[in-house]
Each structure stands twice: as structure tokens, then as C-alpha cells.
């Protein structure tokens, strides 16, 4: 019997064979500190109109949702988790959410936002994908389709094309954080990119000469360079230069997470900046030495929590119009494995935060953790479709029609209704 809980309260890592393969998301562009592929001029908006921002964060490698948001009151939880279980009492106790679910102790910023009703959790969630390949799982998560296969566009890019124009939103295209455009943002809509600077910045004179050359010899490359220079000017205007633009660790390093979050927040907060963005953090494939309240996963979750704080600080001027969603390709096994970690699973969690979020809630149609309740006898069984969450956000936060969501953005999802009550 499922327990319905909707509370209202105050790329692959080492050890996974896919890590050695070349990513399908190869570099699509290069530059100095910025990567850009297209450019869209800003659209004037009516004074006083709502100006929403949406940021999608992808945790690559498969987040262990049973550790991030442990169901501490499920009678089967502690025995299944063994050494990686999160305790409800003690020095490193889980942070309370609603009496049934709790939060990993490394996520203090998220816990505060939850208490302030600016953050929520959706548990036992997954895409339609039921296999356990990182690449296929991430492709399905980002493409928005109901099955894996060759695709050339992502659902967030298609959402940009369907976004209403005029007074409700001022859009300047999408923003990708990192050295390549993620699949979720690929497509016909305009996209620009930013990444921490890894080589010395080119001088203005060199940039001008290259632009003149490309505009005469290769107009398409000239457009891309012009877009990159435009984004560079925006980054400089927002103070993302010098030491702030130097890499502070990889995408799986807490410092790298925080730096990427700071860059995304500053660019999204700019009055003439983009309104929709995506970034990803690697390293969540915790097959071995995962740890419980402390250890490898705790370090990653602490970095993610630091990124949440950076979002809140950097987006402060527009925080009330901001929604952030954090997702992963699939979950991990319910049982601890023989190397004190967890293996590829199915159901997991998604996080929502921001001033536009109707927070203080855990959305969960809880399936239970007894063996007969697990998916294939090993995984948390998903009872919610990630597409329902995406649809609810895009409909209620960005004003995209249900018809466009079902037909263009998430084809084949007519049976998946957008989730209600996610935003204010």
C-alpha cells in the first residue's frame, strides 16, 4: 500500500565503465573564457511586468536520493542502507523536513530555504527511462522524449521557442554554463555560453581583427565570435573577471560548483542578460566509499548546498522571480553494496528552490522500501514523472501552454499532466 506524503512544513565517476568513453556531448565551440553559438537581442518588457528566471541544474552520475533526502521513518530504511544510512539523531543527524523525510546534514542552506518556504522536494521521481546507462539516461533527461535515441535538440531549447513574448518575459536566449552546449539547450533557439577562463584573455585589438576576418571569410563563424564577445562584455559588466573567472576546481569539486553557480547567477540577474539557463555538476556516481553523513557524497552535497547559497546571493535582485530545479538521470540502489556505496538505480529526488517556489513541501507518493515494494526488487520505485515537474514549472512559471508542452516540448507526453502547486 502506498503512503501518499505531501507535507507542508516550517559524467560518470571513477569505477564506472562509462567514465572511460568519450562523451556524446563533445565540445561544440571554443573561445577564451566564453563559448557562444548564437545571439538574440533583448525584447523590451512592460514596466512592472513579471520577469521570471529558470535555472536547470543537472547532477551527472546519478544522485542517491535515499541519502540526499532519507525517508528516516520508513521501517525498512536503516537496514537497507547499512553503513551509508543517515541517522535521525547524533552529531551528524539528518535535518528534519516533515517527520517522515529528512535532509542530508550537509545541506543546511537548502534546509533553511525549506523552512522559509522557498524550497521543496519531489521524491520517488524518474524519467521514463528504466535501464541504467548514464549516457542514455542523461540523453532522455535532456531531450524530453519518452525513449532513448538520436536527437538533435533539448526540451529547454524547445521551451525557449515556445516562450511567450511581450510583457510577461524578457528573453535574450538561453545560457549554458560550461565548455560545451549541453543537449538540453541544443536546438534552433538562440543560446550563449559562459565558462571559467582557462587561458589568458585575448586583447580587444586581436578580437577586433579576428571579427573583421571572420565576417569577410566565414560569416557564420563571425556571428558566433560576435555573440561570444557580446557575452564577454556582459560578464565583465557583471564583474565576472580576473580571479572570479579562473577555474576553482572541476565540476565535481565543491569550489567548481560554487564558481559555476556564481557565474550563472550574475548573468541571469543582469537586466539585459538571459532568463533561462542550464549547468551541470559531475561526480555523483558513488559506487564505492560513498559515505553516509560524512564522506564522499557528503562533500558533493556540501558543494551543491554552497551553489544554492551562491544562487540566492547572486540572484538576490530577481530572487522572487526565480525558480531553480535540480535533477539527475536516475537514482541508485536501495541497498548498500559491497564497497560501501550504491549502484545504478531508478527512483530518486528532485530539488526546487527560489523565491518563486511555493516551498516547504515534500511531494511524494511514497512506494515504500520493503523488498516487494522495490522496483525489480532493488531500486526505489518511481511514482512521479520528471516531465510532470518540468511541465508544471514551464506552464506556471514561464507561461507556456499545455498544448505546446505536450506536442512540441515533450512529444508523446499527452498522458503526463503538469504538476500543480510548484510555484507561487
Regions found by a protein language model. Give the residues of each.
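Feature for exported/extracytoplasmic and membrane-associated proteins, marking the mature portion
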Residues: 2-314, 335, 349-353, 358-424
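Short glycine-biased active-site loop of nucleotidyltransferases that positions the nucleotide triphosphate
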Residues: 133-134, 338-344
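Metal-dependent active-site segment of extracytoplasmic phospho-/sulfohydrolases and closely related
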Residues: 308, 312-339
